[in-house]
Design a protein with these regions (language model features):
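Non-catalytic signal-transmission and effector/linker regions of two-component phosphorelay proteins
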Residues: 1-10, 16-18, 23, 110-134
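Conserved phosphotransfer cores of two-component systems
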Residues: 49-51, 73-80, 99
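Acidic, metal-coordinating helix/loop segments flanking the phosphotransfer/catalytic sites
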Residues: 37-55
């Protein structure tokens, strides 16, 4: 993938099975991942500030305040993470993208779709100066 540094990822989904599947899927794609997990918006907000992930995979229906409000808050960060929004509801795409998501993936799509979008974002991280090997 062109990155020789660790990639900090935050998985935010209330469902343990979804987080586990995402972690397994991403670990097969890259070996230098540091992944943390959140189960609600409060945890996600705290982890964004302290962990400073480069990439967030966010369940649009995550318990707590609306995910859109949190995405808008990301804009105030010095280094906004890339965000892939996941939802079981395809109709949520417009709202997620308007709130600042970089990518929207419906949970009903094949895992390959998520991997394609993941690769695109990771390559973008490497080309915008955030990769320390450049």
């Amino acid at each position: 993938m062109g990155r020789n540094t660790e990639l900090r990822i935050l998985l935010a989904d209330h469902d343990t099975r979804v987080r586990s599947a995402l972690q397994t899927l991403l670990a097969q794609e890259m070996d230098r991942l540091v992944i943390r997990e959140c189960t609600d918006i409060a945890c996600l907000a705290a982890e964004i500030k302290t962990y400073k992930p480069e990439l967030v995979l966010l369940d649009w229906e995550l318990p707590g305040r609306p995910a859109a409000a949190l995405l808008f808050a990301f804009h105030g960060l010095g280094s906004k993470p890339k965000v892939i929004v996941l939802s079981a509801r395809p109709e949520a795409e417009k709202a997620a993208m308007a709130a600042g998501a970089d990518v929207f993936v419906c949970k009903g799509e094949p895992p390959e779709q998520l991997l394609i979008r993941f690769r695109e974002l990771v390559q973008g991280l490497g080309s915008n100066g955030r990769d320390s090997t450049e």
